[in-house]
Amino acid sequence: MAREFSLKNTRNIGIMAHIDAGKTTTTERILYYTGRIHKIGETHEGASQMDWMEQEQERGITITSAATTAQWNGHRVNIIDTPGHVDFTVEVERSLRVLDGAVAVLDAQSGVEPQTETVWRQATTYGVPRVVFVNKMDKIGADFLYSVKTLHDRLQANAYAIQLPIGAEDDFKGIIDLVEMKTYMYNNDLGTDIEVTDGFPADMADQAEELRGQLIEGVADFNEELMMKYLEGEEISIDELKAAIRQATLSVEFYPVLVGSAFKNKGVQLMLNAVVDYLPSPVDVESIKGINLDTEEEITREPSDEAPFSALAFKVMTDPYVGKLTFFRVYSGTAEAGSYVKNSTKGKRERLGRILQMHANSREEIPMVFAGDIAAAVGFKDTTTGDTLCSEKDNIVLESMTFPEPVISVAIEPKSKADQDKMGQALAKLAEEDPTFRTETNPETGQTIISGMGELHLDILVDRMRREFKVEANVGAPQVAYRETIRGAAKIDSKFVRQSGGRGQYGHVVVEFEPNEEGAGFEFENKIVGGVVPREYVPAVQNGIEEALENGILAGYPVVDVKARLVFGSYHDVDSNEMAFKVAASMAVKQLKDQAKAVILEPMMRVEVVIPEEYMGDIMGDVTSRRGRVEGMEARGNAQVVKAMIPLSEMFGYATSLRSRTQGRGTYSMHFDHYEEVPKSIAEEIVKKANG
């Protein structure tokens, strides 16, 4: 089978937005205009739109699919869904890993909002080129130039308008294209009757000329040839300007801004043109790097069909029709349905059963995938999010996504016996889809504990369990994932001797413990000289230490960032065995409590609260009362932003408290930042509670 679209004509994009900027409608309209069946103008008076939308409402395909494939102007556009809420930054990060470019959607009334900033910063970290779509131009208070200004003021983004709206709010009736110098007038609300004229409308010509001048000046910074022409007053052709805007956008230091109203079907086709004109194809971005498992060397995989097959699984979903779907992005090479590939992350062989591509209102089974494609596989057994897939001959592991450890846990119990069995299956499926969601059974109480990235994260998962798996469950009070560590060094001599007639037990170790660097985890070194502890017992010593650290020394929380050195010991020819050394090692850990200054650590959250100015004093006081540190404040438009570091244990119920303090006008976002030592008085309470 030959390729349908060349790599150069492929675009893998995400739609990024704040919760209410209109991301869903924008995505729906993109799919409507690129739909293979309903090309605009083929059907009468919008009948096509209505039936499509009804089917859409019944099945909800576009919004639930992790990646949808569409066509536009001879290009293939794969749209990867990105969530809009901050508890799901992991979802956002994982989609940013597999897309090449993005459309940032803003609300024309509010411009850049707090969540926009978080997502924007993540996209900058991953070096993702963006175009900006200022949506909801028909809304009361919509102001295009103000929105462009917020990009400069709040994100310090080098953003330039490449379009200008004609009218605003109810009067929004057209768009001026500053690049091609054309005017688009919309004569109906379906976006089907469009009148295109060359030049600018007379009453807006001055403003349009001025903005076009600013655009050329802005883009000339990235292109010397254009700069010379501009300074010498020569005519710059439309093609030259487009090429220069593309070059500047790909540098991730220049952002073209477009305008429209997805709901009223205005500006979406022009935005699709911009996606094709200015966003990168897989060939324009840096080739993916990975580690060759055989040689341990870093290697690069070129985006080409001739290169060996390599792909990254970026989302696992459970589909009611076909079961487990694994969405993956192909970086190099090709693979056929029915063939075997290797999951190099897990070292397992997987069969690529069927390959599906999701379209706006259908799913298509395809015989093979090519470099740059995004598709879903049916039939994978062991593959989870972040795993690398490659050809069986060429071992490579692409840099995997790193997922933060969950910071909040709750106990969950089924409401009835019937729910009991279903709950286990539901939790297993949800954990498979979301790497930051963990589920475990507490061995002492038999309770099921679920852990995640925040209260909202867990609420939504419990809600999905009810909706998708029909499991009713009661949820307990949230618990914080504390950790323990040591602040001092200690040399501990630990002997385990048991003699009760017949063969005894004998294990003796001397272990030096000291704090490791933050985040470095547990390190074990064997410094035994002269075989005083036989080599075959050393793994048992390490094992004993690790298990004991996992069970805590103060309050039963895992101990992190510790170095252990086995320096001396002794053994008995008859009575020594692995078990005895394991017990001796774990007894050594118990003694750390008094000898190595053991402390409890708690997760600290980076919190941003956005509030109207009059609540400033109240909120600052509240942050302090929650043991928080205010780390900065800034004015953002007419609101104030308070940035603070607050312990997670003090953040429960904050959403409700903030709502009542600010009459519902405050918003906040928080994400895990680091672990910090708990103050003595609180540590004593935690220990008391843990040890009952």
Curated annotation (Swiss-Prot):
Residues reported in the UniProt entry to bind GTP: 17-24, 81-85, 135-138
Cellular localization per UniProt: Cytoplasm
A GO molecular-function annotation: GTP binding
Keywords noted in UniProt: Cytoplasm, Elongation factor, GTP-binding, Nucleotide-binding, Protein biosynthesis
Pfam families named among the record's database cross-references: EFG_C, EFG_III, EFG_IV, GTP_EFTU, GTP_EFTU_D2
InterPro entries attached to this UniProt entry: EFG_II, EFG_III, EFG_III/V, EFG_IV, EFG_V, EFG_V-like, EFTu-like_2, G_TR_CS
Domain tr-type G: 8-283
SUPFAM superfamilies xrefs: EF-G C-terminal domain-like, P-loop containing nucleoside triphosphate hydrolases, Ribosomal protein S5 domain 2-like, Translation proteins
GO cellular component: cytoplasm
One GO process term, biological-process aspect: ribosome disassembly
Keyword Nucleotide-binding listed: yes
Family the UniProt entry places it in: Belongs to the TRAFAC class translation factor GTPase superfamily. Classic translation factor GTPase family. EF-G/EF-2 subfamily.
Function, in words: Catalyzes the GTP-dependent ribosomal translocation step during translation elongation. During this step, the ribosome changes from the pre-translocational (PRE) to the post-translocational (POST) state as the newly formed A-site-bound peptidyl-tRNA and P-site-bound deacylated tRNA move to the P and E sites, respectively. Catalyzes the coordinated movement of the two tRNA molecules, the mRNA and conformational changes in the ribosome.
HAMAP family assigned: EF_G_EF_2_B (MF_00054_B)
NCBIfam families linked: EF-G, PRK12740.1-3, PRK12740.1-5, small_GTP
Entry protein name: Elongation factor G
Organism: Exiguobacterium sp. (strain ATCC BAA-1283 / AT1b)
Gene designation per UniProt: fusA
